[in-house]
Amino acid sequence: MINNDILRRLSNMFNFNAEKIQAVFALNQCEITSAELDCILKEHDDPDYQELTDVQLASFLNGLIVEKRGKQDGPDRLPEQELSNNIIFNKIKIALALKADEVIAVLELAGLVLGKYELSAYFRNVNNKHYKRCTDEVLSSFISGLKIKYQA
């Protein structure tokens, strides 16, 4: 999925305005100006469109974890330099403190049926033989299911 779309969909789901989005970024020591955010939230075909980098999205997701679960002791988590759908999926799951059964229920709201074993493969280490790459379809379904759950 495109990082800008993920940010836009999550922000809409939680009814975050521009100031709140900037505040979530700041929770992970990432400063985004209002002008930058305006360009990031524009549609792809807009000439002022600016691509959200993996580091920026990782910072937002780390900030979302702090926003939803509170700050933990120790140093702030450094944002990943490269993101995969698996990492994004896991960070959203952590931010919302969702257990496997809850994630499965959220996916079912979006019309995607997965078993616990299948789901756990997305959260394994990339070097694990049972690791499974998360597709755009699965991540999109998860975000769609969350929107249904949280806006119902």
Regions found by a protein language model. Give the residues of each.
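Helix-boundary capping/turn motifs
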Residues: N12-F14, T33, L96
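Short, structured motif recognition centered on aromatic/hydrophobic residues
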Residues: I6-S11, A18-F25, D54-L64, I88-K93, ...
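Short, flexible segments with low predicted structural confidence
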Residues: R8-R9, E31, F60, G74-D76
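N-terminal flexible/basic segments that precede or flank functional cores
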Residues: C39-P75
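Short, solvent-exposed interaction modules
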Residues: N62-V113
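A cross-kingdom feature marking solvent-exposed beta-strand/loop segments within repeated
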Residues: M1-R8, N17-L52, L112-D136
